[in-house]
Design a protein with these regions (language model features):
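Acidic/polar-rich alpha-helix caps and helix-coil junctions
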Residues: 1-64, 68-74, 83, 88-268
Length: 268
């Protein structure tokens, strides 16, 4: 809440309070591995085909509140944009890329005519989205940087990276000023929490006082669909999300508007 309101002192305070109580991180060097699927695809050890089995979700020790994205469809899959794939600049040493991105998933698992990776966490359709200790480290680091303590911010974010990267000189990020520190921390945030927090980050970063952290215009192309058909013989439709677009505002629940006796107005 406080981070989204750009109230960095308060966000820092509560992130630090959480970490004082519980600061455990999963070490991807020793606590993650890959299992081989029967079709030759390597899946992370967190994965479970049975979406009704919650053992591995409950066992994820970074979770502060167990919550995850889900489509309600066991075969719904998260396919990354090229921009997200490019965000993992060190694919050789970044263990998040090694374990959570399944190469050739589209071709091997969904019999697609082309090869493309998929992002996988607990299942094809379940991605961690609840608050975690990793997110608290990132909130703490970003707030420290924005408040001028960029050297300490780098120490904070590097504590997380040490659990996510193969050991080596590439683990530690360095910054010489606030802008550089914030930029690197936001890049790390995107690598750590794809799909779950990106929408909210794009919205807040385009609506704060700084301009150096703005997210540029987002453009996507999708085929027209209905309940039964994908019209893949037609030209795809281009969708554009401008900076500061009102499309970032989600509709307010009609129930909330009604019980407020008109005080709350609908987003338009």
């Amino acid at each position: 809440y406080y981070l989204n309101r750009n109230r960095y002192e308060q966000a820092l305070k509560y992130a630090e309070n959480v970490l004082k109580e519980y600061d455990v991180l999963v070490d991807y060097n020793s606590e993650m591995n890959k299992d081989v699927f029967e079709q030759g695809v390597y899946l992370p050890s967190t994965f479970d085909w049975d979406v009704q089995t919650y053992t591995k979700r409950i066992a994820w020790k970074e979770s502060l509140y167990m919550r995850y994205l889900t489509s309600g469809n066991a075969v719904m899959t998260y396919f990354p944009s090229q921009s997200l794939l490019d965000a993992y600049e060190d694919k050789e040493h970044d263990l998040r890329y090694r374990y959570h991105f399944v190469e050739d998933a589209a071709e091997v698992m969904f019999w697609s005519s082309y090869s493309y990776p998929a992002y996988v966490f607990f299942s094809m359709s379940h991605v961690l989205s609840g608050p975690t200790t990793a997110e608290m480290y990132l909130i703490k680091a970003e707030c420290q940087a924005r408040l001028g303590e960029y050297s300490r911010a780098m120490e904070t974010v590097n504590a997380l990276r040490a659990k996510r990267m193969v050991p080596g000189d590439w683990v530690e990020l360095k910054a010489g000023n606030v802008k550089e520190a914030v930029t690197k921390i936001l890049q790390e945030r995107r690598r750590e929490m794809p799909f779950s927090q990106r929408w909210f980050d794009m919205r807040r970063l385009n609506n704060n006082e700084e301009t150096y952290d703005d997210v540029e215009i987002v453009t996507r192309k999708f085929y027209k669909i209905n309940a039964t058909t994908i019209f893949d013989k037609e030209e795809p439709i281009t969708y554009t999300l401008e900076k500061n677009s009102r499309k970032y505002a989600l509709p307010i629940s009609e129930n909330e508007i009604e019980i407020s006796d008109g005080v709350i107005k609908q987003n338009v």
